[in-house]
Regions:
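Hydrophobic alpha-helical transmembrane segments and their immediately adjacent juxtamembrane loops
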Residues: 41, 215-312
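Peripheral, non-transmembrane regulatory/ligand-interaction domains of membrane transport proteins
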Residues: 1-203, 209-212, 216-226, 311-312
């Protein structure tokens, strides 16, 4: 647990929980949850809600505080490039301070603790909420661009050997976009409800930032839809190329089988137990050489015909 406070426009660490501070809980243990719950009269279940990866984005008005849960992107460990999932970020607003709860250390929150966000103050609670949502929306867009860049890299493999790992990675990218689309729509719903709640104090500057957040989230939703269509097209292209390569392989195998069968057919005819007088070139001392030459000529003509028909 870390406690921050803005003093003279500078973010500093605070000694205890009091008015105007930001309580940052990252993967809190039971003792930290109990301490915050007792001091601020907040239900422990609400503090632990964001620690459940299955928790959906929502906003809830409780007695004495407001609970906001949104989804943020996080990279999947030990997965390929561009493979992400979403996890909940909990924001609790009381009359005097703000609390954030997350199961992992994420740039959405850590950028504020590292003073990388301008115009940030722990005392401006609603502005802080909108800045968190804005940071999450821009992070979605950054990850979406990385996903599309990785898709383009996979497309370059089409000219060479297509590996099973490429198909699995493409499936992972598509799954990531499904998670993003679902989470962004849920975040957009939470944002719409925030604009209608009169209980949350709003300022004109906050409303301008809120408009920016709405624009960024909608843009992220549009980007997700576009990139999903792109990946769908890439997947269909992969499938078409694999089918085409299989068809070509079958054509080559069929052509080679035909060329191998011609000498077998001719030699089989001469190997039958029949009267030699009825077999061409049977009486010639050069009969074997003539038959071999004729066989080669037939195979050469057949190979030329197959090549003209793009079967060899």
């Amino acid at each position: 647990m870390a406690i921050y406070e803005t003093v003279e426009r500078r973010l500093t660490r605070a000694e205890g929980i009091h008015e105007g501070v930001w309580v940052c809980l990252t993967a809190p243990d039971a003792e930290e949850v109990r301490e915050v719950s007792c001091q601020l009269d907040i239900e422990p279940a609400d503090l632990r809600a964001a620690l459940d990866p299955e928790e959906s984005a929502r906003i809830s008005l409780e007695d004495g505080y407001t609970l906001i849960i949104v989804d943020i992107p996080v990279k999947v460990r030990d997965a390929g490039e561009g493979i992400y999932t979403t996890i909940p970020l909990g924001i609790l607003l009381t009359q005097s301070l703000i609390i954030t709860v997350c199961s992992v250390d994420t740039p959405v929150v850590s950028d504020f603790a590292s003073c990388r966000v301008r115009g940030f103050s722990t005392r401006k609670k609603m502005r802080f909420v909108y800045q968190l949502l804005y940071r999450a929306a821009t992070m979605y867009q950054q990850e979406l661009r990385l996903i599309d860049r990785r898709r383009q890299e996979l497309e370059k493999h089409l000219t060479g050997t297509l590996r099973d790992s490429d198909l699995m990675e493409l499936h992972g990218l598509e799954s990531t976009l499904v998670y993003f689309a679902t989470s962004l729509r849920a975040n957009n719903t939470v944002l719409d409800r925030l604009t209608r709640y009169k209980r949350l104090e709003q300022y004109p500057d906050d409303m301008e930032l809120l408009d920016d957040v709405i624009v960024e989230i909608r843009q992220a939703i549009e980007m997700t839809g576009i990139y999903r269509d792109d990946i769908k097209g890439t997947r269909e292209l992969f499938s078409s190329i694999l089918d085409n390569r299989l068809n070509n392989a079958m054509k080559y195998l069929t052509s080679i089988t035909l060329l191998v069968a011609l000498p077998t057919l001719i030699s089989g005819l001469y190997g039958m137990n029949v009267n030699a007088a009825g077999m061409p070139f049977a009486g010639s001392p050069y009969g074997f050489a003539i038959v071999c030459g004729f066989t080669l000529a037939v195979c050469a003509v057949a190979a030329w015909i197959l090549h003209k028909k793009h079967m060899l």
